[in-house]
């Protein structure tokens, strides 16, 4: 049977969480700026090894040419900035950070990974976003927390595997970036802000794969992370 929770799909821009997390790990801050401009790269084809030109494009097909903050770049899901950060921070470092945050699927060491080109599943993606909500502390997902008998005796307690994998500052910065998706001008999930109670603390990230085959939304609050996939 096809299990949509564990099925492998391209995460699209939801993967930018790991690109920006590694950027924060390496000392950048949401107020730092990068330019949204044309990029052309020579990349070997995975199957043939032939060198091809890869030109990452934004969703609207345009490059503003503006130098914008990372907070705005994340909120607007600007592809060129994510690709540039991927090259600056190192794809191998981004892979390591993604794995530490909860991604178990194999990830390709290629520039397009910054845009979510490698398949992951919904369960591990939600788990990784939980790491940000949990102030940088990762915990493996657990279905059964404990089992008690009819007398109330605990016959099984799930082991705790909590581990601090992100510095608190990185997690805090990423929480602010996720909020920006709902609040920043041009934020890809800003339209949802009208449906959220003003006293609640929510953030979110959208994602779309090539040809719009997959659409994702990750909603994050301090106590709850929800992932949705349509495709």
Describe these PLM feature segments.
Residues 48-58, 89-127, 141-143:
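Mid-domain, small-residue-enriched loop/turn segments at the edges of structured enzyme/sensor domains
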Residues 24-32, 104-106, 134-139:
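Secondary-structure transition/capping motifs at alpha-helix termini
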Residues 28-94, 138, 149-179:
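Conserved catalytic neighborhood of penicillin-recognizing serine enzymes
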Residues 1-18, 31-36, 112:
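Short active-site loop at a secondary-structure junction
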Residues 1-4, 15, 72, 76, ...:
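A penicillin-recognizing enzyme superfamily signal
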Residues 32, 37, 111-113, 142-145, ...:
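Extracytoplasmic/periplasmic beta-strand context in beta-sandwich domains
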Residues 1-6, 79-81, 106-113, 159-160:
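Glycine- and acidic
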């Amino acid at each position: 049977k096809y299990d949509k929770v564990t099925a492998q799909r391209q995460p699209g821009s939801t993967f930018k969480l790991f690109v920006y997390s590694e950027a924060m790990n390496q000392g950048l801050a949401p107020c730092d700026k990068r330019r949204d401009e044309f990029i052309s790269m020579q990349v070997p084809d995975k199957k043939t090894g032939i060198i091809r030109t890869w030109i990452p494009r934004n969703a609207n097909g345009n490059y503003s040419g503006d130098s914008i903050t990372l907070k705005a770049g994340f909120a607007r899901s600007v592809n060129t900035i994510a690709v540039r950060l991927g090259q600056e921070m190192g794809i191998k470092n981004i892979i390591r950070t993604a794995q530490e945050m909860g991604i178990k699927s194999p990830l390709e060491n290629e520039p397009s990974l910054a845009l979510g080109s490698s398949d992951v599943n919904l369960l591990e993606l939600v788990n990784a976003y939980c790491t940000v909500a949990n102030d940088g502390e990762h915990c493996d997902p657990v279905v059964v927390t404990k089992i008690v008998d009819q007398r109330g005796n605990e016959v099984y307690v799930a082991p705790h595997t909590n581990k601090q994998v992100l510095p608190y500052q990185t997690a805090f910065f990423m929480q602010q970036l996720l909020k920006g998706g709902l609040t920043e001008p041009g934020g890809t999930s800003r339209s949802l802000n009208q449906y959220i109670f003003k006293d609640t603390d929510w953030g979110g990230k959208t994602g779309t794969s090539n040809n719009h085959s997959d659409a994702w939304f990750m909603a994050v609050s301090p106590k709850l992370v929800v992932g949705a996939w349509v495709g």
